[in-house]
Design a protein with these regions (language model features):
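Accessory beta->alpha helical hairpin/"wing" motif in late/C-terminal subdomains of nucleic-acid enzymes
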Residues: 66-87, 135-166, 226-246
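Long, charge-rich C-terminal accessory regions
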Residues: 200, 204-311
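Charge-enriched amphipathic alpha-helical scaffolds
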Residues: 77, 122-135, 200-231, 305-340
């Protein structure tokens, strides 16, 4: 999802990963509010409804990109949009983001209507709405994802197919690779993962659909656009994407990436466990100890000064930091590996 918040003038306590994630979810909820109460594939959907849905859809962005300019005003009919959705439904179903696919499976199993029990599910739900497959009823704890029976029935047949499963294995492999890359670098040009994914898919039933690969990236990861208009995937905890604008296409083979991720995990795990043990039962009600420690680790990766790290820690607690906490934080601040993308972008 496009990064919504501008953090450049904020203090570090206001731009932790937890805070930025909450702002992303609030923006997502705002996007979903005010949409038509009908999905494109429901009988009551009108052409006026279809036009409103189109404006939020991936189709609108793709059409603007192809034309290279603002689109001429035109009413998109229900029939036209339904045909566009169904034309690539088989391929798109296989190329959903991991979180979208999880929601799709649940929706199919439960007859096209599921509660969004976790606020974090709003982002993949919004992506499914942008694909014009679903709608979301209600907000907050009462939010429900609704998928028309026509699409549920079609998806049910696809989910059981061997070709679908084969593509999903590739999708999950690429998803994990991108997540590891973002944790290592902080950001990555989308062109590299897109090329890699296309090469893995070239002999499958979904070959030749670069627009669906782009949708997968937009739906599955936080992103911004660099100064040249290129898609830049960013870690959800990266507070200032501008610092990464100079990052080049850094591609690592899966084996090297796996080894680097394992090495970082071996280094960070003891730091994480030590700090977590000290924060149990002393974090503010709105944040878990696990999220608090993760916030601190991600800040350390961005070379946040020790003084600011201590202020952030204080803001997360219901008490003053103890000497043990300060010592653990100093150790974490000194030893957590910095994001390679920060140093890479500085030399451009």
């Amino acid at each position: 999802m496009l990064r919504q918040c501008d953090t450049r003038t904020l203090q570090w306590a206001d731009k932790t990963m937890s805070v930025m994630r909450a702002e992303q979810l609030e923006a997502c909820e705002k996007d979903l509010t005010g949409l038509p109460s009908r999905c494109l594939f429901e009988p009551e959907c009108s052409n006026i409804d279809a036009e409103k849905l189109y404006e939020l859809s991936f189709f609108a962005d793709e059409d603007r990109s192809i034309s290279g300019r603002a689109l001429r005003p035109a009413l998109h009919t229900v029939e036209q949009l339904r045909n566009r959705v169904l034309h690539t439904f088989v391929q798109e179903c296989a190329l959903l983001s991991v979180e979208e696919h999880d929601l799709l499976v649940r929706a199919v199993l439960f007859g096209g209507r599921i509660s969004l029990n976790d606020w974090n599910e709003l982002i993949p739900a919004r992506a499914l709405v942008r694909r014009l497959w679903c709608r979301v009823e209600g907000v907050g704890e009462n939010a429900v994802l609704v998928m028309p029976h026509q699409l549920c029935a079609s998806a049910l047949l696809l989910l059981a197919g061997d070709s679908h499963k084969a593509v999903r294995n590739i999708v999950e492999q690429v998803h994990d690779s991108i997540e590891n890359t973002l944790y290592l670098l902080g950001a990555a040009q989308a062109a590299g993962p897109a090329r890699h994914m296309a090469s893995l898919l070239k002999d499958t039933c979904v070959a030749g659909h670069p627009e669906l690969i782009t949708r997968f990236l937009l739906a599955g990861f936080d992103y911004v656009y660099d100064r040249s208009g290129n898609l830049l995937l960013i870690h959800p905890g990266l507070a200032d994407p501008d610092k990464m604008m100079g990052i080049t296409n850094t591609e690592m083979n899966p084996e090297a990436l796996s080894k680097a991720s394992d090495s970082i995990n071996d280094l960070e795990s003891p730091l994480y466990e030590r700090m977590l043990g000290l924060l149990i039962d002393v974090t503010r009600p709105e944040i878990t100890p696990e999220d608090a420690v993760e916030d601190l680790i991600i800040l350390a990766k961005q070379e946040v000064p020790w003084k600011d790290m201590l202020e952030v820690l204080s803001s997360l607690l219901i008490c003053q930091p103890t000497p043990e906490m300060r010592s653990a934080l100093k150790d974490l601040s000194d030893r957590v590996p910095r994001w390679l993308g920060l140093s890479t972008s500085r030399v451009q």
